[in-house]
Amino acid sequence: MSKKTKVSMAVIRRLPRYHRYLEELLKNDVKRISSRELSEKMGVTASQIRQDLNNFGGFGQQGYGYNVEELYNNLTKILGLDKTYNTIIIGAGNLGQAIANYTSFEKSGFNLKGIFDINPRLFGLKIRDVEVMDIETVEDFIARNKIDIGILCIPKDNAQYTADRLVRAGIKAIWNFSPIDLKVPDDVILENVHLSDSLFTVSYRLNEEELFKKLKGETAKIDG
């Protein structure tokens, strides 16, 4: 289980997309945008956008649309991006290092405080001035540095055990890149990320037309 939300996850997953696009509009000095224009860019209906935003009070004006800066600022607060969060990465392999090197997270308020691994050869390695440390010290580090989010980038065999350790140490949110769906207490926020899911979606779309041609042919044979 994981901490339940008051708004559907489908809505929550669309909010970062709205926020990202509004940021681009601001950079291009766009002052306002209609629901229709926003829907064309987002690939969802104008009605859906209005429903999504109405969960938080609604921000548009009839006949005017949305003030881009105002909506962006409101979404920043809704997403909690007006605050800062202390994070750690568990696993200093290729994926862990890639996430550590992604500077946009820090710009959004996610401050990387430590990286942990089981491999002694990696201890002392610095990634953007953040040192790789022994995983056996993680509980003390979490307590001393008031860590909010643990980012798991380790093989699935150790993922649940490690997640349990983080939870016992006081972590309240886990961003999990390990290829396994973790289980955590109800008061802990968990986001399981399977990178292959997105790639498999691409492969499906590449094969969709061929798939339905075959299905249509098989249906025709049955009907015949």
Swiss-Prot record:
Protein keywords: Cytoplasm, DNA-binding, NAD, Repressor, Transcription, Transcription regulation
Keyword Transcription regulation: yes
InterPro entries tied to this protein: CoA-bd, NAD(P)-bd_dom_sf, Rex_DNA-bd_C_dom, Tscrpt_rep_Rex, WH-like_DNA-bd_sf, WH_DNA-bd_sf
Record localization: Cytoplasm
GO MF terms, alphabetically ordered: DNA binding; DNA-binding transcription factor activity
GO annotation (BP), single: negative regulation of DNA-templated transcription
Main localization (coarse): cytoplasm
Keyword tRNA-binding: no
GO cellular component: cytoplasm
Pfam families xrefs: CoA_binding, Put_DNA-bind_N
SUPFAM superfamilies xrefs: NAD(P)-binding Rossmann-fold domains, Winged helix' DNA-binding domain
Binding site for NAD(+): 91-96
DNA-binding region, residue range(s): 17-56
Membership in a protein family: Belongs to the transcriptional regulatory Rex family.
Subunit-level organization: Homodimer.
Its biological purpose: Modulates transcription in response to changes in cellular NADH/NAD(+) redox state.
Protein name: Redox-sensing transcriptional repressor Rex
Taxonomic source organism: Thermoanaerobacter pseudethanolicus (strain ATCC 33223 / 39E) (Clostridium thermohydrosulfuricum)
